[in-house]
Amino acid sequence: MSFRDVLERGDEFLEAYPRRSPLWRFLSYSTSLLTFGVSKLLLFTCYNVKLNGFEKLETALERSKRENRGLMTVMNHMSMVDDPLVWATLPYKLFTSLDNIRWSLGAHNICFQNKFLANFFSLGQVLSTERFGVGPFQGSIDASIRLLSPDDTLDLEWTPHSEVSSSLKKAYSPPIIRSKPSWVHVYPEGFVLQLYPPFENSMRYFKWGITRMILEATKPPIVVPIFATGFEKIASEAVTDSMFRQILPRNFGSEINVTIGDPLNDDLIDRYRKEWTHLVEKYYDPKNPNDLSDELKYGKEAQDLRSRLAAELRAHVAEIRNEVRKLPREDPRFKSPSWWKRFNTTEGKSDPDVKVIGENWAIRRMQKFLPPEGKPKGKDD
C-alpha cells in the first residue's frame, strides 16, 4: 500500500540513469557478472566457504515470480565487503539474467563520492543512500518501494475512500525493464559492526527506515532473513589508516558462513501492513492525499509501528544466529535503539565493557564529510 507521489519519486530516482537503454542493461549485467566472478574466485580459492539454506532463497525467488511479489532479503552487516562477497557464495545458476541481480543500498559518501564510482555502483544496481540526518524519507527508499511494487499493480496505490487511481498507468514506461518484480537486499543496521570478544558477531538495532519497503510496496514482499559470519576476517575494521588497505583480503583459510533462513510468515507481514493501512486512513492529509502526511512520517503511532516491525526483522535474523548457527547469545542490550544511541552519543563511555573494533562509524564526529551542525529535527531513525 503506497502513495502515488512516493511511487513517482521512486521512478524519478531510478530515472537518474538510463536504465532502459540496451547498452546500460548490457553493461549492468556485465558489471554484476564480472564482480560476481572475481569475488567467487577470491572466496573459493582463499577461504573455506559454507552456504546453508540456499534452497530457501531459490524457492523465494520462484515464489516472487509466481506470486508477482517483490523479494526483500535482510542481513547483518559485518564488513565493507559483505556486498558483493555474500553473493559469490551462491551458485552461478541463480544469476542467469539481469532480473535476478539484487538491488541494494550503498552509502552516498563512500560508493558515490565521484563520477566513476557512482556509475560503477549504479551499474551494479546499488542505490545511493545518504545517512546522518537525511532520514528514511529519501530517494533510495522511495526507489526501493517502487522496485518492490510490480509494474502491473501501480493502481493499488492508496487513495481516499478506497478509490482506485490509475494515473501512473496512463502512457507510462517504467524506469527499468523487467520480467518480474525486483529483489532488494538491505543491511538494516546501517553501519558495519565488529566488536571485540565476548560480543563478536553481534548486531546493532535495525533502523526503521527499511520497514517502509514492507509497509508501502503495492503488494507485500517476500522477506527472507540472512545471517553471515567470516567477512569481518577478510576486511577487518582494525585497519583504520586506509580504506584500500582495509578491504585487502587477509586471514586466508578462514571460514565464511552464510546461512539463509525461512521467509517471514505472510500473515505476520499482512498484520503490520493492515496496521499501516489503518494509520493511513486515520492520518492522511485531505489537502494532499497522494503523499505521506507529517503524521504518517513523524507521528508517534507511525514511528512505533515501524520500530516494532524493525525489531521483528532483527529477531528473525537473530534467530538464525542463535538457533541455527548456535552462537553464544547476544547481549540483550544490543537490540535496544536507546542503548545504541546512548552508546554512540557518549562514544562508548556509557558501557565501557563493549569495545568496537576500529572506528564506530555511527558516531557523527567520525563522518568527516558532514558539517558540524546537528541533524535536522525529527528525521533521525
From Swiss-Prot:
One of its GO terms (molecular function) is 1-acylglycerophosphocholine O-acyltransferase activity. Residues 215-232 are annotated as: Required for membrane insertion. InterPro entries: Plipid/glycerol_acylTrfase, Tafazzin. One of its GO terms (cellular component) is mitochondrial outer membrane. It catalyses: 1'-[1,2-diacyl-sn-glycero-3-phospho],3'-[1-acyl-sn-glycero-3-phospho]-glycerol + a 1,2-diacyl-sn-glycero-3-phosphocholine = a cardiolipin + a 1-acyl-sn-glycero-3-phosphocholine; 1,2-di-(9Z,12Z-octadecadienoyl)-sn-glycero-3-phosphocholine + 1'-[1,2-di-(9Z,12Z-octadecadienoyl)-sn-glycero-3-phospho]-3'-[1-(9Z,12Z-octadecadienoyl)-sn-glycero-3-phospho]-glycerol = 1-(9Z,12Z)-octadecadienoyl-sn-glycero-3-phosphocholine + 1',3'-bis-[1,2-di-(9Z,12Z-octadecadienoyl)-sn-glycero-3-phospho]-glycerol; 1'-[1,2-di-(9Z-octadecenoyl)-sn-glycero-3-phospho]-3'-[1-(9Z-octadecenoyl)-2-hexadecanoyl-sn-glycero-3-phospho]-glycerol + 1-hexadecanoyl-sn-glycero-3-phosphocholine = 1'-[1,2-di-(9Z-octadecenoyl)-sn-glycero-3-phospho]-3'-[1-(9Z-octadecenoyl)-sn-glycero-3-phospho]-glycerol + 1,2-dihexadecanoyl-sn-glycero-3-phosphocholine; 1'-[1,2-di-(9Z-octadecenoyl)-sn-glycero-3-phospho]-3'-[1-(9Z-octadecenoyl)-2-(9Z-hexadecenoyl)-sn-glycero-3-phospho]-glycerol + 1-(9Z-hexadecenoyl)-sn-glycero-3-phosphocholine = 1,2-di-(9Z-hexadecenoyl)-sn-glycero-3-phosphocholine + 1'-[1,2-di-(9Z-octadecenoyl)-sn-glycero-3-phospho]-3'-[1-(9Z-octadecenoyl)-sn-glycero-3-phospho]-glycerol. CDD domains: LPLAT_AGPAT-like. It is found in: Mitochondrion outer membrane; Mitochondrion inner membrane. A motif (HXXXXD motif) lies at residues 77-82. Its EC number is 2.3.1.-. Present with 1340 molecules/cell in log phase SD medium. The enzyme was named after a masochistic character Tafazzi, once popular on Italian television, apparently due to the difficulty encountered for its identification and characterization. This is Tafazzin. It comes from Saccharomyces cerevisiae (strain ATCC 204508 / S288c).
